A protein has these predicted regions:
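Residues forming the Rossmann-fold NAD(P)(H) cofactor-binding site
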Residues: 56, 119, 230
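N-terminal secretory signal peptides and thylakoid transit peptides that target proteins
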Residues: 1-19
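Beta-strand-loop-alpha-helix segment that lines the small-molecule cofactor/substrate pocket
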Residues: 114-115, 119-167, 181
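Conserved SAM-binding strand-loop segment of SAM-dependent methyltransferases
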Residues: 92-96
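N-terminal Rossmann-like NAD(P) cofactor-binding module of classical short-chain dehydrogenase/reductase
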Residues: 109-110
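Predominantly a Rossmann-like dinucleotide-binding segment in NAD(P)-dependent oxidoreductases
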Residues: 50, 154-161, 165-260
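N-terminal Rossmann-like dinucleotide-binding module
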Residues: 15-88, 168, 236
Length: 267
């Protein structure tokens, strides 16, 4: 099988950063991608578990990747499957993710289901010998995150998550500058994310409310902190290269009094 390597210099050039040492000091996980191999005849046979709005957004990119073959779709909501088939018309359809994992020909899965379901699916996928991309946030609790990490380590399978800022050239460049001391000593960081929408999606029937608007209910979601603020919190830890020792926060439902039970504002 023929391999065409992309040089580290070209890889870094594409990020707009000149020095490998500085880059990898700021973003050490990129070392795994510093020599990318283009294979001539192999594709990753991928299953999408949860091809809802986020899953289909990712499918839009994957469908253009010549090294990916989306071979399976799994969802309990028929309209999601119907829309996903427009992007992957030859994919096999499933209603139970466990049946997907039984298919030995599938190399990897992409998990874009409600947060509360991530851990079980990911653990089962590792046990089935699959590589995993799991959308953020990874787990419903810290204990779940630890279990998934340990399973990843014990199985040796690839585990990737959707914290996209880690690969955003703008953030990588900013961290390079921060860690190089360009702005002096960093004593405080303030991050913001403002949205003025109600975070709701229309439902065809009231009995589908929690299935479709799962982000609004504590049974399935941790609300704004895991669905949006996780990106901002990551920036702080990345910039300071530290994990917080203490955390204080507050939130409330002050505007969208529509039956949701997660806060509509947090800080």
């Amino acid at each position: 099988m023929k391999h065409t390597p992309i040089s580290r210099r070209d890889f870094l050039k594409n990020l707009g950063i000149a020095g490998a040492g500085t880059l990898l000091a700021a973003s050490p996980w990129l070392s795994a991608f510093s020599e990318v191999m283009n294979t001539s005849n192999e594709k990753c046979r991928l299953a999408i578990i949860g091809p809802g709005s986020r899953g289909r957004f990712l499918m839009g990119f994957l469908a253009k990747n010549p090294k990916v073959d989306i071979v399976a779709l799994c969802d309990i909501y028929k309209p999601s499957i119907e829309n996903a088939l427009k992007l992957a018309p030859n994919a096999k359809v499933y209603g139970d993710y466990r049946e997907v994992l039984e298919d030995k020909s599938i190399d990897a899965i992409l998990v874009a289901t409600p947060l509360s379901s991530h851990c079980k699916i990911v653990l089962d996928a590792f046990d089935a010998g699959k590589h995993v991309f799991c959308e953020k946030s990874i787990g419903f609790t810290m204990e779940e995150c630890y279990r998934m990490y340990q399973k990843h380590r014990s199985t040796g399978k690839i585990f990737f998550t959707g914290q996209q800022r880690l690969f955003d050239p703008r953030y990588i460049k900013a961290m390079e500058m921060i860690h190089a001391g360009t702005f002096g000593e960093i004593n405080a960081i303030r991050t913001f994310w403002n949205r003025n929408g109600d975070w709701r999606r229309s439902v065809p029937s009231p009995n589908l409310e929690r299935l479709i608007n799962w982000r609004l209910y504590k049974e399935f979601s941790k609300g704004l902190m895991t669905e949006l603020a996780c990106h901002q919190l990551q920036i702080g830890s990345w910039a300071l290269r530290k994990i917080p020792e203490k955390v204080m926060g507050h939130g409330a439902i002050t505007y969208w009094k529509d039956g949701r039970d997660v806060y509509d504002n947090v800080s």
